[in-house]
Regions:
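Conserved mixed alpha/beta catalytic, RNA-binding, or beta-rich assembly cores of soluble enzyme
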Residues: 1-179
Length: 179
């Protein structure tokens, strides 16, 4: 995970970074190593970046990592009612999202999560930064909704969850999240 000591720089990093954005180490022994943004952790304001294990072995605290932030403001042609956030357009294209005969977008999610299982992150002022957690200790819910089988990169539908202007419950709304 990465974080700038400068609060305003870190807020910009958290706000503008999108999953799938390219990241490159530009100082230190791992200079030139490339990775990509995988998410954020709002509680500690860290941007999460994947690098190969051998590159991580050459990194040290204080190395500078350049994130090519791209994707906030992404729009889907013909679907002005859909709000995209926090995703690199190149990654978005790889998700296999299709438009059906009725003009409705179909997203290949692996499961649906009901609003009552969404926890930490609810009530945040914006969904453009931070994270949003599926939270349950209920073994039956874990099995019923396939939570126990989720993997990094899986797409999930969040039922009755609206993230347009912060995170909130809104009956009949849907949000798509990436694990």
């Amino acid at each position: 995970s990465i974080k700038s000591e400068d609060s305003s720089e870190n807020k910009a990093l958290m706000l503008l970074s999108c999953i799938g954005n390219k990241a490159k180490v530009i100082t230190g022994c791992a200079k030139g190593a490339e990775g990509f943004v995988t998410g954020m952790h709002g509680g500690i304001d860290h941007t999460l970046v994947y690098f190969k294990e051998e590159d991580l072995e050459n990194m040290s605290i204080g190395d500078t990592i350049l994130v090519k932030a791209h994707g906030q403001g992404l729009a889907v042609d013909g679907h002005e009612d859909v709000k995209c956030m926090n995703i690199d357009p190149n990654l978005f294209e790889k998700f296999g999202i299709k438009e059906n005969k009725e003009g409705i977008l179909e997203v290949p999610v692996v499961t649906e999560i009901p609003a009552y299982l969404m926890g930490s992150g609810v009530g945040s002022a914006t969904a453009f930064s931070g994270d949003y957690d599926i939270m349950t200790g209920d073994n039956e819910a874990n099995k019923e909704f396939g939570i126990d089988k989720l993997k990094f990169g899986d797409l999930v539908l969040l039922r009755d969850c609206d993230n347009t202007n912060g995170r909130q419950y809104l009956k009949d709304s849907v949000s798509i999240g990436v694990i």
